[in-house]
């Protein structure tokens, strides 16, 4: 190696050329007063010493980049890139590489410093030949170029003359941002590398196809450029960064990779970076090495506002300068500097998006105006400042503004300044109190916490952030749903807004739950039973059926036991409850079809209605419910609500009755009956009365009797030849019966034993009728065996008034049900079982023949409390001589709920029962029978005060677990 001479020689030695791999003698000269820094090579060292002309001279000032090349099969290669082309040197080892490369870079840097230009070396430089394909010929970029890569851009530098042999101009140098590259690739066999540009690139949208020296170079270009595009996309990808002192390239934000046009709808993640520099350097686009761009991706669609090519000489500047620019730095300091020349309030950066693209490079608007931020033109929704915390400087910084800053910087303070005077402090406190007092809204459903909680009254930065305005009652509730459930029924104590409920639904208790809590406190167990299948039929046509249910609700108004109801049931539903109010004073409603005379005596203040004298044509179900217009529907209770339950010619007495008077109306062991009359009536108008509870074994024992009964039954001709003795009729007027009520009681007491014996025979006769006799044809009843045990213990004394049991009135639907033949078999057993199940009553309906007189209807009742097995259930029945026909309405066409009949020839019994819950809280405990909270019964006939019957239009009872269907 030659030593450094006086002419400025720095290094010399034998090296290899990259293209030919031949050894040449290279000499590196420094810049002197007479010559420039250069690199020369000779064929041999001898020619160098002989001062022969060098084979080639490369001036370092013409080299825009000197770096190490790694894409060749040689490990130690240094490339000098210039407008004349690239020149590669292959060294022997790493030490020689470092020595020569460092010296070359020092000389290049010295040249740049002497010329006052910035030196920004490229990371990678490839020499390619751009083909006349795609947009290359259109934009004039063809021929040999240097493809130079940085972390931000891809620059093409022309090699050779700027004119083609055809005289066409060539682009000398052009820089393409990596964010405007949609994709890139290579074709190995053909040594082709291509890039697809987006519409925001300086060349516009299109493809650039370039040829490399070999396939390895094309592959290396693809991998290197793709990795540069993929680097650092997660941070600061769509902001353009300009640095005062160029930092390490690895720390500059970069997009991940390019995206195709069909991904234009992807969201943009804009992040603001922090930098220690407080001022920004003015950069010019004329030098392609002193700035960099970063964005997340390129989306190229048909329309655009402009391109960088239209303003290639734009100036990129920071906030210290007022020149026009299409971009600004992403630097936004989070702390306000006292010595800053800009206002204390830093505006957030904005992103400008084209009409059909998710993001685009900032472009000049050609009007000389400058915006601190980019505007989103696509979105129809404006940004909410208070929701973007990062877009605002800290509020504490605004309170740091002092008078010194105002005087030094000649800015009028636009931020709230702390008053230092004590008077100002006092005035401020008074104003705060006035504002606080004005925020008190007297709305019953609005929380009184006011909106003052949104204010920070102790701080001085109330003006830095706009206060969100809430409408009344619309503030966000922070309480959980389960916490709100504890205050469903306590609106006054709940500070939050509560749901509006309709009348009677605030308890949020399902109606079915209300009906299941009617048991006494000492009888806590639930009565669950399967309801027998029943249907409402008319002339053989089925109108509906119900499946087995274990829980149901009844139509009677019941008290709400809140401690037994789950509070979260139906909490989101609105329920309209037509049941009575929970006030015990207003729960005493008695529904009845006919109002007897003695009811008026008990309730003298109750108004009489004309509906008591009306009749119902028992021809269909519609006639029963809708046959007459109910005049008593206009009568409302004291709580102002109209009774919505289906009633007949109902009667609603006054609610201010005494418990003792109501107790007299209970089904008890009445000893009185209306006087027996001999008034004749058509036989087809008689009510056939029978008990039930003939077991399946009893039905099987008498098939021949049932067939005989079936053949002799006058069902087809609607007549019956038997002489009923278990019913009574009267033709006396309503006034006669009310005056002679005491005489009726005496007559009934004398004929009690005779009627019981005769009635027991008729009951057994009717019980022996065969209607199918299936065990599943049982209707559960509402009284338990325990209740009947208590009733039976008190039923031995038939003369006592207050120790009566429950009376059952049974309605038959056909005249053929009563047979002249009596079956005495199983009387004691059947009546004993029947007396344990019969607890409710049904209503008899008067005939039109007796509609002229209010008291022309007749009643019958049966006592199931007798201790005698044969006549236990019928000891208090009233009756007449067998020769006395009864004038009672025939109701075989009534569509009461009943089970389906197994035989067509035999009619069904349509049984209706009424579950009378305990509606009055004033009844003493001594008048209540254990296990049964039923209101006092009311007689169904205006003349007879000894019996009663009511109709419940609900088809089943959840608590009736011990009764069967009437088999008539």
Swiss-Prot record:
Compositional bias annotation for Basic and acidic residues: 697-711
Keywords: Differentiation, Growth regulation, Oogenesis, Phosphoprotein, Repeat
Residues the record lists as Phosphoserine modifications: 286-287, 342, 555, 932, 935
Composition skew (Low complexity), residue ranges: 956-968
Reported effect, residue 165 to T: In strain: FSP2, FSP15, FSP16, FSP19, FSP23, FSP29, RR8, RR11, RR17, RR18, RR35, RR52, S76, SL5_131, SL5_29, T28 and T39
Effect on the protein of changing residue 744 to S: In strain: FSP3, FSP15, FSP16, FSP23, FSP25, FSP29, RR8, RR11, RR17, RR33, RR35, RR52, S108, T9, T15, T28, T39 and T41
Start-end of Polar residues biased regions: 304-329, 529-555, 712-730
CDD domains in UniProt: PH_IRS, PTB_IRS
PROSITE patterns: IRS_PTB, PH_DOMAIN
Annotated motif YXXM motif 1, positions: 411-414
Residues modified to Phosphotyrosine: 411, 911, 948
Record region (Disordered): 248-269, 304-370, 528-555, 697-739, 922-968
Gene Ontology molecular functions: insulin receptor binding; insulin-like growth factor receptor binding; phosphatidylinositol 3-kinase binding; SH2 domain binding
Domain of life: Eukaryota
Motif (YXXM motif 2): 641-644
GO cellular component: cell cortex; cytoplasm; cytosol; intracellular membrane-bounded organelle; nucleus; plasma membrane
General function of this protein: Activates phosphatidylinositol 3-kinase when bound to the regulatory p85 subunit. May mediate the control of various cellular processes by insulin-like peptides. When phosphorylated by the insulin receptor binds specifically to various cellular proteins containing SH2 domains. Involved in control of cell proliferation, cell size, and body and organ growth throughout development. Also has a role in a signaling pathway controlling the physiological response required to endure periods of low nutrient conditions.
Additional record remark: 'Chico' means 'small boy' in Spanish.
Name of the protein in its database record: Insulin receptor substrate 1
Species classification: Eukaryota, Metazoa, Ecdysozoa, Arthropoda, Hexapoda
């Amino acid at each position: 190696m030659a030593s450094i001479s006086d002419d400025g020689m720095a290094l010399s030695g034998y090296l290899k050329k990259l293209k030919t791999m031949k050894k040449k003698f290279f000499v590196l000269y420094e810049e002197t007063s007479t010559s420039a820094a250069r690199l020369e090579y000779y064929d041999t060292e001898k020619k160098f010493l002989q001062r022969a002309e060098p084979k080639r001279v490369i001036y370092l000032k013409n080299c825009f980049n000197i770096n190490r090349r790694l894409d060749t099969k040689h490990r130690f290669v240094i490339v000098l890139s210039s407008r004349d082309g690239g020149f590669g040197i292959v060294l022997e080892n790493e030490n020689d590489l470092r020595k020569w490369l460092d010296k070359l870079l020092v000389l290049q840097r010295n040249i740049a410093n002497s010329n006052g230009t910035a030196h920004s070396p490229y990371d990678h430089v490839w020499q390619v030949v751009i083909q006349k394909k795609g947009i290359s010929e259109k934009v004039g970029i063809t021929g040999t170029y240097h493809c130079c890569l940085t972390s931000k851009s891809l620059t093409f530098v022309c090699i050779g003359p700027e004119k083609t042999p055809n005289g066409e101009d060539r682009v000398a140098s052009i820089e393409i941002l990596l964010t405007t590259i949609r994709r890139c690739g290579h074709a190995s066999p053909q040594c082709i590398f291509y890039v697809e540009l987006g519409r925001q690139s300086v060349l516009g949208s299109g493809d650039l196809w370039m040829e490399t020296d070999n396939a390895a170079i094309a592959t290396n270009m693809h991998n290197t450029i793709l990795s540069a595009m993929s680097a650092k996309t997660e941070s600061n990808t769509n902001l353009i960064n300009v640095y005062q002192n160029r930092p390490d390239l690895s720390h500059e934000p970069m997009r991940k990779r390019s995206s195709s046009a069909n991904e234009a709808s992807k969201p943009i993640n804009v992040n603001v970076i922090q930098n220690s520099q407080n001022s920004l350097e003015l950069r010019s686009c004329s030098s392609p090495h002193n700035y960099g761009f970063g964005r997340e991706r390129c989306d190229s669609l048909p329309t655009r506002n402009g391109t960088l090519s239209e303003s290639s000489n734009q100036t990129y500047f920071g906030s210290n300068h007022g020149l026009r620019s299409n971009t600004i730095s992403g630097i936004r300091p989070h702390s306000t500097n006292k010595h800053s020349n800009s206002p204390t309030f830093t505006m957030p950066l904005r992103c400008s998006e084209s009409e059909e693209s998710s993001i685009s490079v900032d472009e000049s608007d050609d009007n000389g105006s400058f915006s601190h931020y980019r505007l989103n033109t696509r979105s129809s929704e404006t940004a909410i400042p208070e929701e973007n915390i990062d877009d605002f400087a800290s509020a504490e910084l605004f309170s740091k503004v002092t008078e010194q800053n105002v005087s030094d910087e000649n800015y009028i303070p636009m931020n709230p300044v702390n008053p230092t005077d004590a008077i100002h402090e006092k005035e401020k406190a008074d104003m705060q109190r006035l504002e606080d007092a004005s925020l008190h809204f007297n709305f019953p459903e609005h929380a009184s916490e006011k909106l003052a909680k949104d204010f920070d009254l102790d701080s001085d930065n109330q003006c830095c952030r706009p206060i969100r305005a809430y409408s009344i009652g619309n503030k966000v509730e922070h309480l959980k749903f389960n916490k709100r459930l504890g205050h469903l029924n306590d609106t006054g104590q709940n500070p939050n807004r509560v749901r509006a409920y309709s009348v009677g639904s605030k308890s949020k208790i399902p109606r079915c739950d209300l009906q299941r809590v009617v048991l006494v406190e000492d009888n806590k167990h639930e009565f669950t039973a399967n309801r027998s299948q029943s249907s409402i039929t008319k002339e053989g046509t089925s109108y509906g059926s119900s499946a087995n249910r274990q829980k149901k609700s009844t139509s009677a108004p019941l008290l709400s036991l809140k401690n037994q109801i789950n509070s979260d049931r139906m909490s989101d539903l609105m329920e309209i409850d037509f049941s009575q109010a929970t006030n015990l004073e207003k729960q005493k409603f008695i529904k009845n079809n006919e109002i007897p005379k003695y009811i008026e005596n008990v309730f003298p203040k109750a108004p009489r209605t004309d509906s008591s004298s009306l009749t119902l044509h028992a021809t269909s179900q519609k006639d029963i419910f809708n046959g007459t217009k109910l005049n008593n529907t206009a009568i409302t209770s004291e709580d102002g609500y109209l009774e919505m339950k289906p009633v007949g010619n109902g009667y609603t007495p006054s609610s201010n009755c005494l418990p003792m008077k109501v107790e007299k109306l209970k089904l008890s062991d009445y000893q009185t009956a209306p006087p027996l009359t001999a008034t004749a009536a058509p036989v087809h108008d008689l009510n056939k009365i029978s008990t039930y509870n003939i077991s399946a074994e009893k039905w099987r024992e008498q098939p021949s009797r049932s067939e005989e009964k079936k053949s002799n039954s006058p069902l087809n001709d609607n007549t019956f030849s038997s002489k009923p003795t278990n019913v009574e009729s009267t033709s006396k007027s309503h006034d006669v019966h009310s005056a002679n009520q005491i005489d009726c009681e005496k007559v009934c007491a004398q004929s009690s034993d005779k009627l019981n014996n005769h009635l027991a025979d008729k009951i057994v006769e009717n019980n022996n009728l065969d209607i199918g006799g299936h065990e599943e044809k049982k209707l559960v009843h509402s009284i338990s065996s325990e209740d009947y045990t208590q009733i039976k213990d008190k039923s031995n004394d038939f003369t006592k008034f207050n120790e009566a049991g429950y009376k059952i009135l049974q309605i038959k639907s056909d005249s053929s049900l009563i047979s002249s033949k009596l079956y005495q078999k199983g009387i004691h057993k059947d009546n004993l079982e029947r007396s344990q199940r019969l607890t409710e009553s049904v209503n008899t309906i008067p005939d039109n023949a007796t509609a002229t007189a209010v008291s022309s209807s007749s009643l019958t009742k049966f006592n199931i409390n007798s201790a005698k097995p044969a006549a236990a259930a019928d000891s208090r029945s009233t009756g007449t001589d067998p020769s006395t026909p009864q004038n009672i309405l025939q109701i075989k066409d009534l569509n009461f709920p009943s089970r389906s009949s197994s035989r067509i020839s035999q009619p069904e019994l349509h049984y209706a029962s009424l579950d009378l819950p305990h509606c009055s809280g004033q009844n003493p405990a001594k008048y209540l029978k254990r296990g049964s909270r039923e209101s006092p019964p009311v007689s169904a006939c205006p003349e007879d005060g000894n019996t009663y019957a009511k109709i419940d239009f609900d088809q089943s009872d959840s608590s009736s677990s011990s009764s069967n269907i009437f088999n008539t």
